[in-house]
Amino acid sequence: MSTAIDVNPLLYASDTSSSLYDAARSFLEGVAAGPELVYLFWPTAMAYVRIATHPSIFGHPLTSREAVGNLTSLLALPHVRSPGEPSDFWATFSIVANEVAPRGNLVPDAHIVALMRANGVSGIWTHDRDYFKFDGINVLNPFAVS
């Protein structure tokens, strides 16, 4: 099963003041070790750079160079994919939108779900419970204690 990574594990791994910092770093080290196919969609990457460098969100925000460098390292791994929207993407997004009727902060999640469907990805590593609203998505919490 291929999976996608949502923005929050990336953010927790970059925020040393977070109680989830160590768990997020450990999770990303596991992702980096491979060999499972992992998707990092462009909206997730852009959200990471936007939030990780924002001084009102992070007490010690990353520089743009640091944030971009973190993603560059992740994207350089042979088992990490970053496809964009296919030419028929709007049809896929429309189906997702008709199922969930996203508004506000749920719109970016619907975008990610549509990208997942377009690329045959069924699972997402996230700490965001909103993904449970989408049918057919296996929500995987990287911080769940097993």
Regions found by a protein language model. Give the residues of each.
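Short, well-structured N-terminal submotif of metal-dependent ribonuclease cores
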Residues: M1-L40, P55-G69, S146
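Acidic, PIN/NYN-like endoribonuclease modules and their adjacent C-terminal/linker elements
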Residues: S2, V113-A114, A118-S146
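Acidic active-site catalytic centers that drive phospho-/nucleotidyl reactions
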Residues: D6, D109, D128
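Structured helix-beta-strand junction loops
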Residues: G34-P35, L77, F134
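Short beta-strand segments at enzyme active-site cores
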Residues: Y39-P43, T126-H127
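Conserved alpha-helical segments that form or flank metal/cofactor-binding pockets of metalloenzymes
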Residues: I51
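Active-site neighborhoods of divalent-metal-dependent phosphate/nucleic-acid chemistry enzymes
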Residues: P61, V80-G123
